[in-house]
């Protein structure tokens, strides 16, 4: 009886010892995946199996994980497929619409927004406007200077000038007639006649004789008749028309001195700049410009923009991924992870499985111990 009890105790002991050995061995094997974190030495000799498998092969793990992510998880095809889903388009549209609403209802002025990016926006904008206007006016001046005056005025302007010539001649002759009828005109005639007699006849007898005759009274009616004559009117009209025609055929550049041209440009620029209410525009709240356009921007432009953005992303997704180099990013991020933290991640995912492996080791060890005990008894 005592022998049987001893055999049972030995059998149980062998089973327990086998189970403990199996469980401890498996638990130790699992721990050796992560620990120790660094190589251990006895003197100058490294202890085998140190560091643990994962710390030892950390670089290979990071590289393989990076390749796996790029080749099998985050692929261009998968991302393109995801981008084509309506939820992505809707999310982008909604995000842009929210930004548009924020800007279209903003009470901030253009000046406040501009001052975030540039100092003294009004002065710099004024300078740029003046430079731009100056360039445009210079360009216009170059084009205009090579054109004939008749081309600049156009057919309508040229016709108006030519139509006005008869009236101008009429006014000119009328003013001339009135001038010679006036005391100043008579005095001028007397001076002219006196100078003529003095220069041509001198102080001789004939000159003294003419000096006593009122020649102006004789000339004035005749001069008036000539001025009022149709032939004079026609002659003056033809002469003016010829001069006007000659003038209209000249280029604008031939009529302007460089200094006069510069003065005209400066005056035009000054006039344009003073008419631009730049300060008032910069101090206007942003919503006053954009709020009337909010519905059109949000309902028409934003969906179109979102669609174009998604299509562009789909077209460029492979190039974007190549530029981002996701494999390198994953590898570098895994390399940066603390090994203890990496161990915690793996254990948090596989803790039950590792525990089951430990119990399985204990079970197998116990079975082996039982088989050994049976063989020992037999």
UniProtKB/Swiss-Prot annotation:
Keywords: Cell membrane, Membrane, Transmembrane, Transmembrane helix. The keyword Protein transport does not apply. The chain crosses the membrane at residues 5-25, 357-377. The keyword Protein biosynthesis does not apply. Belongs to the UPF0754 family. InterPro entries: DUF445. It is found in: Cell membrane. It comes from Exiguobacterium sibiricum (strain DSM 17290 / CCUG 55495 / CIP 109462 / JCM 13490 / 255-15). Pfam families: DUF445. It is a multi-pass membrane protein. This is UPF0754 membrane protein Exig_0680. GO terms for cellular component: plasma membrane.
């Amino acid at each position: 009886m005592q022998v049987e009890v001893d055999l049972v105790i030995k059998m149980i002991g062998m089973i327990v010892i086998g189970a403990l050995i199996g469980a401890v061995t498996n638990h130790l094997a699992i721990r050796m995946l992560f620990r120790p974190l660094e190589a251990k030495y006895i003197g100058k000799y490294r202890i085998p199996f140190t560091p643990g498998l994962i710390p030892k092969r950390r670089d290979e793990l990071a590289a393989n994980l990076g390749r796996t992510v790029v080749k099998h998880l985050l692929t261009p095809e998968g991302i393109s497929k995801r981008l084509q889903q309506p939820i992505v388009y809707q999310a982008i549209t909604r995000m842009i619409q929210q930004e548009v609403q924020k800007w279209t209802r903003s009470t901030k002025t253009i000046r406040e927004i501009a001052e975030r990016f540039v100092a003294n926006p009004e002065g710099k904008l004024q300078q740029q406007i003046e430079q731009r206007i100056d360039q445009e006016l210079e360009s216009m001046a170059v084009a205009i200077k090579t054109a004939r005056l008749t081309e600049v005025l156009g057919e309508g302007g040229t016709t108006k000038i030519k139509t006005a010539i008869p009236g101008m001649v009429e006014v000119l002759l009328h003013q001339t007639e009135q001038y010679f009828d006036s005391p100043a005109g008579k005095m001028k005639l007397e001076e002219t006649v006196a100078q003529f007699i003095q220069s041509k006849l001198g102080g001789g007898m004939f000159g003294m004789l003419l000096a006593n005759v009122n020649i102006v009274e004789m000339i004035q009616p005749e001069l008036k008749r000539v001025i009022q004559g149709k032939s004079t009117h026609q002659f003056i009209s033809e002469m003016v028309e010829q001069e006007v025609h000659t003038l209209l055929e000249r280029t604008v550049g031939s009529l302007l001195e460089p200094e006069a041209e510069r003065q005209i440009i400066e005056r035009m620029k000054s006039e344009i700049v003073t008419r631009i209410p730049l300060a008032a525009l910069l101090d206007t709240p942003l919503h006053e410009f954009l709020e009337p356009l909010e519905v059109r921007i949000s309902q028409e432009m934003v969906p179109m923009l979102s669609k174009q953005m998604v299509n562009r992303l789909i077209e460029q997704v492979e190039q974007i991924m190549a530029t981002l180099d996701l494999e390198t990013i994953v590898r570098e991020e895994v390399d940066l992870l603390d090994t203890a933290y990496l161990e915690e991640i793996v254990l948090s995912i596989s803790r039950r499985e590792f525990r089951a492996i430990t119990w399985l080791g204990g079970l197998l060890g116990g079975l082996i111990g039982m088989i050994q005990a049976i063989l020992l008894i037999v």
